[in-house]
Amino acid sequence: MKTWKKGLALAAAAVLALGLASGCGSEKKADAASGKAPLKVATNATYVPFEFKSKDGKDYTGYEIDVVRAVAKELGRDVEFKNIAFDGLIPSLQSHEVDMTASGMTATKERAGKILFAAPFYATKLAVVTPKDSPIHSVEDMQDGAEVAVQMGTTAAYYAQDKGMKIRGFDHASDIVMELKAGGAKSGILDKPAADYFVATDGKDNFRVVDVPDSKVQYFAFGFNKDNKELQQQVNKAIADLKQKGTLNELHEKWFKTPVPKMPATCEEALGNTD
């Protein structure tokens, strides 16, 4: 942006800078007014409908992403998402690379030994996705060494292992879906909402869902570094406020067409119902 008048150039540059500062994306804009740093959030954006990239690849979307943004709004902070492999989420907290994780992570006692969890914002069970003409009609049909696709490091992988299934491990939930569609896998275990979403969209007319009644209820929760109890408590309050205002229910209705289920009020209560 060059002009023959130096004064005009400086003025134009100042206006441009001001415009960029005020008009950039809501998650990247400066937070000078509040003096609060952006909330750095690690996510593995491959898990439809919880966290995934928009069609143009420029933005993050999904139920959990919406909840994060609502929480950040309660805290008066902007959000900066960082896309990280699922098995790198906890290390990213431990190294202080990020402030919080938001990636369909179940609060478990094992993980709680490494990080802090906020109050849960979602409850679900596991489900199996299999082709419509598959002989699999119950979990019992998958035991005795049956091969199943799972995302490594997840409760689905632990469940399959406990049941004696032969595991085909993948880094991302989206890889499981691609493998099912390509015919390389005859079954995959996902969280039930993800399974239902796939069968209703990309897998429509070709796949079906088999419930896993003996899987325990899983509570999804945001994670924090062990030394960041202050942020954990702030997020706990924000989640409680979102429940009270009805915002969490609105977001749940938006993505799942059902009211938000009743959940434990604290992580400690949730951990009493998980392994």
Regions found by a protein language model. Name each.
Residues P91, M105-G113, Y159-D162, K186-K216:
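A ligand-binding cleft/hinge motif common to bilobed small-molecule-binding domains
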Residues M1-P38, N273-D275:
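Short, low-complexity disordered leader/linker segments with a strong preference
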